[in-house]
Design a protein with these regions (language model features):
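A short, charged, amphipathic alpha-helix used as a generic interaction element across diverse proteins
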Residues: 25-46
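Short aromatic-glycine-(Arg/Gly/Cys) micro-motifs in beta-strand/loop hairpins
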Residues: 1-17
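Short, mixed-charge low-complexity intrinsically disordered segments
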Residues: 39-62
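Generic alpha-helical structural signal
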Residues: 11, 28-29, 51
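Ordered hydrophobic segments in well-structured contexts
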Residues: 4-8, 21, 46-48
Length: 62
């Protein structure tokens, strides 16, 4: 079953945060996606992935 995860992408203090809703089976698949996004976009400094229960979350940053 696909769970709903919210990705918060922080590009820095001056630019507002961007929220994306994604569906995945496991949070680890989204962590890999977040790491790829960090490599491709130098403006992104932190990506927070919040799970549907708010108990499972992961932060990917440089």
């Amino acid at each position: 079953m696909l769970k709903r995860y919210e990705l918060t992408i922080n590009r820095g203090r001056k630019v507002p945060q961007e929220h994306k809703i994604m569906r995945a089976v496991q949070i680890s698949s989204l962590v890999g996606l977040a790491e790829d996004m960090l490599e491709q976009d130098d403006d992104i400094c932190t990506i927070t992935i919040m799970g549907p229960t708010y108990k499972e979350y992961e932060v990917v940053s440089r």
